[in-house]
């Protein structure tokens, strides 16, 4: 995990959920303008207060993958397509990129 402070930087909609054999994929809209640079593959992000790793980044969306245990023990099991989620960007990434 990474440091999660509970600050909400923005919200974004969930656009797709895919159930795989032992995990779930959650696809979110990426519409953060200048903050898009904080979303990188294998980087950290907090969604609804949960520390997660970004699995894939595309031009207008990003995806995280969660194992069944994470799905069943977090609020992710209640999410539905079009739900708005709270996003907190990784503080260390933000600090480094803002001080280049």
Named regions from a protein language model:
Residues 1-100:
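Conserved loop->alpha-helix
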């Amino acid at each position: 995990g990474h440091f999660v402070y509970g600050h909400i930087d923005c919200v974004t909609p969930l656009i797709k959920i895919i159930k795989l054999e032992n995990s779930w994929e959650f696809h979110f809209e990426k519409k953060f303008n200048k903050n898009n640079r904080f979303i990188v593959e294998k980087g950290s992000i907090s969604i609804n207060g949960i520390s997660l790793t970004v699995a894939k980044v595309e031009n207008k969306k990003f995806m995280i993958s969660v194992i069944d245990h994470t799905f069943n023990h977090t609020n992710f099991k209640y999410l539905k397509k079009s739900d708005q989620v709270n996003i907190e960007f990784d503080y260390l990434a933000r600090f480094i990129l803002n001080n280049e």
